Structures are given as C-alpha cells and as structure tokens.
C-alpha cells in the first residue's frame, strides 16, 4: 500500500523568535513613520481633524508598502495579516501627537 502524505499549506515551521523579531521590526517601522509624519504635520501647520487624517493616511500608506514588500509571502513572516495593518497603531499615535505638537509649537508658535 502506498502511503498518502497530505501537504500542508504555509510554512512547515514557525520560529517564535523570528515572529517576535518581525514584530519588533514592524513596531520600529511604525514608530519611525509616526515620528516623521508627526514632524511633517507640525511643520505644515496641520491642526485638529486634518492632523489626525494625516496620521491615518500615513499609517495606511505604511501598511500598503509593507503588503507590497511581503507580497504573497506574508505568511512566511507573520502568523496573520492583521499585524501589518494594526500592529503598533496606538503607540504610533502617541509618537505622532508628540512630534506633531512639538514641531507645531517650535515652528508656528515661537
């Protein structure tokens, strides 16, 4: 009798250390883009809702760039696609507001 071997979809082994490392890189990217976009919003003088819309656009752009970079092999680097869209989003918002208000104050107030 011939043994039937079922093929598994996805990677055969997922290293937890690699997944944590990828999450750390994703968090670093999100924090860096948040700081850069916050500084840009502050220099441009965006206030109120326009500033938060700018953050959402920057976050969406980063997520799209990460998806384009990973292409169809996202499951090789992450367990699901959700971290690519939502990973570090709230922490990035705090960084964004910090840089936004600091540079707005430095450029437009003083």
Swiss-Prot record:
List of residues that carry N-acetylalanine: 2
One cellular component term from this protein's GO annotations in UniProt: EMC complex
First-listed, main subcellular location of the protein, grouped into a coarse class: endoplasmic reticulum
Keyword line: Acetylation, Endoplasmic reticulum, Membrane, Transmembrane, Transmembrane helix
Regions that span the bilayer: 29-44, 51-71, 90-106
Gene Ontology annotations of biological process type: autophagosome assembly; protein insertion into ER membrane by stop-transfer membrane-anchor sequence; tail-anchored membrane protein insertion into ER membrane
All ranges on the Cytoplasmic side of the membrane: 2-28, 72-89
Pfam families with a match to the protein in the record: EMC6
Membrane topology: Multi-pass membrane protein
Taxonomic superkingdom: Eukaryota
Cell compartment(s), UniProt: Endoplasmic reticulum membrane
Residue spans, topological domain Lumenal: 45-50, 107-110
Family affiliation: Belongs to the EMC6 family.
Quaternary structure and partners: Component of the ER membrane protein complex (EMC).
Function: Part of the endoplasmic reticulum membrane protein complex (EMC) that enables the energy-independent insertion into endoplasmic reticulum membranes of newly synthesized membrane proteins. Preferentially accommodates proteins with transmembrane domains that are weakly hydrophobic or contain destabilizing features such as charged and aromatic residues. Involved in the cotranslational insertion of multi-pass membrane proteins in which stop-transfer membrane-anchor sequences become ER membrane spanning helices.
Name the UniProt record assigns to this protein: ER membrane protein complex subunit 6
């Amino acid at each position: 009798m011939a043994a039937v071997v079922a093929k598994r979809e996805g990677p055969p082994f997922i290293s937890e250390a690699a997944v944590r490392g990828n999450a750390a890189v994703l968090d670093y990217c999100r924090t860096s883009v948040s700081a850069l976009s916050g500084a840009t919003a502050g220099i441009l003088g965006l206030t109120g809702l326009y500033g938060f819309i700018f953050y959402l656009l920057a976050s969406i752009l980063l997520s799209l760039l990460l998806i384009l970079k990973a292409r169809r092999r996202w499951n090789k680097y992450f367990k699901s696609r959700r971290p690519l869209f939502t990973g570090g989003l709230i922490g990035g918002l705090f960084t964004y507001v910090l840089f936004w208000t600091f540079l707005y104050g430095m450029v437009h107030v003083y």
